[in-house]
Regions:
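Short, thiol/selenol-centered motifs that function as redox-active sites or metal-ligating centers
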Residues: 71-91, 160
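A contiguous pocket-lining binding segment that forms or flanks enzyme active sites
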Residues: 105-126, 146
Length: 199
């Protein structure tokens, strides 16, 4: 279990509850709940900042959600964040309908089978996670040759950087893949799995 309590809706202030509900969206249930946000709810201002960052990078922008989910797995795997990788595995398999064998290849860092556009984004995201100072003109030229422009590059950087931060929070707070069931015991559980960010 995490180093902090996950804030439950019935114990949250109105402001915190509103932020968490905005993330969950209209569907309700536990499918869109984020253990990361529930942990950060112990500090409402930080929760609000992280919510805004996640909302703008994951749900906003012009790059498609499939690519952002791919980037989230690449970064989380590079950072060895088991919880984040597991969460986004569900997103890729269920929301994006990525075949399991393709996910496993991405998880293993085998990007050659990906289309050029995804391969370039995956390699860029991995470098952001592991060696951001190593991003040079050659790395950018590879990205641009795959059809990205400067706005796309900055958005990819934003998504990758957001997940570097999320991985750090998740690991430092010791949020584990098995925490979900215990954290939401007694909550509405009509759906299983996580769906939006590093839970």
């Amino acid at each position: 279990m995490a180093h902090v309590e996950y804030v439950r809706r019935e114990d949250a202030t109105d402001h915190v509850s509103e932020i968490l509900s905005q993330w969950e969206g209209e569907g309700g249930g536990t499918v869109n709940r984020s253990l990361l946000l529930d942990a950060l709810a112990n500090h409402p201002a930080l929760l609000e900042g992280m919510y805004t960052l996640l909302d703008r990078t994951i749900r906003g922008g012009r790059l498609d959600r499939d690519l952002k989910e791919l980037v989230s797995v690449v970064v989380s795997q590079a950072n060895d964040c088991a919880y984040c990788t597991a969460s986004h595995r569900e997103n890729l398999l269920e929301i994006v309908s990525m075949p399991e064998e393709r996910f496993e290849a991405v998880r293993a860092g085998e990007y050659d089978a990906l289309p050029e556009h995804e391969r370039a984004a995956a390699r860029f995201a991995e470098q952001v996670a592991l060696d951001p100072k190593g991003i040079d003109e050659e790395a950018l030229d590879t990205l641009y040759a795959a059809g990205f422009d400067e706005e796309d590059m900055v958005e990819l950087l934003g998504v990758a950087g957001t997940f570097v931060a999320a991985n750090t929070y998740v690991d430092a707070l010791s949020i584990q893949p098995g925490d979900r069931e215990e954290a939401y015991a007694g909550a509405e559980t009509d759906t299983a799995g996580d769906s939006d960010t590093d839970r």
